[in-house]
Regions:
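Active-site mouth of glycoside hydrolases
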Residues: 1-221, 227, 260, 275, ...
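Substrate-binding cleft of secreted/luminal carbohydrate-active enzymes
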Residues: 6, 55, 250-315
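Amphipathic coiled-coil/heptad-repeat helices and related helical stalk/stem segments
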Residues: 39, 85, 237-238, 265
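Short glycine-rich, flexible loops that bind phosphorylated cofactors or substrates
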Residues: 63, 232-233, 289
């Protein structure tokens, strides 16, 4: 990414349910006609606002898209996940957008909850146990990378969203929903190896903070990625020149808030470019949380890209 890339986190239409079947949506996700239309609108609005790149969760916390054996181990992808990803690719092409797919969320490792027949989280052992990890990578990650590893609409792969929150002693002290630093690094390294062997797009890991860059130091990543939220890091951290971090690779600001910060979204973009980031993705277009203002997300994209309607002239 040689130019400063501006885009947004979609980051989903429905968390963890865009791709594949679940007890809540036995017919699958985005390939259903009614979901395709909703997707078309969401991507079309982002493209019209000037976004070039969207960040989008694939498996989330594991509530959809997976088949399991009788012992609860992941057996592979269900029969709707790839058709749903195909529908997403079609929508991205139609809108003229590219995507940074996030393979899993840190909630993948959360304590298991069964809600309405759907399994949320509870995948910690598939990260920490080498044999279960190999099974996950062979049966889930490898087929996805093989199918879309040459797809022009896929700009890159984010191996895990904010792994700090599931790494003991880094972002959490709760051993029930985390793994050790060594185990997390092993998971990320093995995942990178599997994806690199099958895909040409660059790999990254969406860190919650630049303070956690050591968690991925030495891993085979092409692009580094950090997020900035004022609740975690001061404005001075955002303004710090990327060159001074000594990372030796492009650094993407993968998330920044459109609500709740002392800086406006436009000021954050200006600061990120001045600091030397390779791009910045607003949070967010579709999420419903304290850091999202969807209207402000679209506004800052239009402002940056010169697509705001001119102010009315005074008489």
């Amino acid at each position: 990414m040689s130019e400063f890339v501006v885009g947004a986190n979609l980051p989903w239409l429905d968390y963890g349910q865009d791709f594949g079947k679940s007890a809540w949506q036995p017919r699958g996700g985005l390939s259903r006609p009614e979901r395709r239309e909703r997707l078309r609108r969401a991507l079309g609005e982002l493209a019209a606002s000037g976004a070039s790149l969207v960040r989008w969760w694939l498996l989330g916390d594991g509530r959809a898209g997976l088949s399991e054996d009788g012992e609860g181990r992941i057996a592979g992808l269900d029969d709707r996940l790839l058709p749903d990803v195909d529908a997403a690719i079609e929508g991205l092409r139609e809108a003229g957008l590219r995507v940074l797919f996030v393979l899993v969320d840190f909630l993948w490792l959360d304590m298991l909850r069964q809600v309405g027949g759907a399994r949320l989280g509870g995948r910690r052992d598939h990260v920490r146990d080498p044999s279960l990890r190999a099974r996950l990578l062979e049966r889930v990650v490898a087929p996805i990378a093989e199918r879309y590893g040459l797809e022009p609409a896929v700009a890159g792969w984010d191996l895990m969203n904010e792994p700090e929150w599931a790494t003991l002693g880094v972002g959490t002290l709760d051993p029930r929903r985390s793994v050790s630093r060594r185990e997390m690094r092993a998971f990320l390294a093995d995942t990178a190896s599997v994806v690199h062997a099958r895909a040409r797009q660059p790999l990254s890991v969406g860190l919650a903070s630049a303070r956690s860059l050591s968690l991925v130091e030495g891993l085979d990543l092409d692009l580094l990625q950090v997020h900035w939220y004022e609740s975690l890091d001061p404005v001075t951290a955002l303004a710090r020149p990327v060159e001074s971090l000594g990372v030796g690779r492009p650094l993407l600001l993968g998330e920044f808030p459109t609500r709740g910060a002392s800086l406006s979204p436009r000021s954050i973009l200006d600061m990120a470019r001045e600091a030397g980031y390779s791009g910045a993705l607003a949070w967010s277009a579709q999420a419903a949380d304290h850091a999202t203002d969807a209207q402000a997300c679209h506004h800052v994209l239009r402002d940056w890209c010169g697509r705001l309607a001119p102010a009315p002239r005074e008489a």
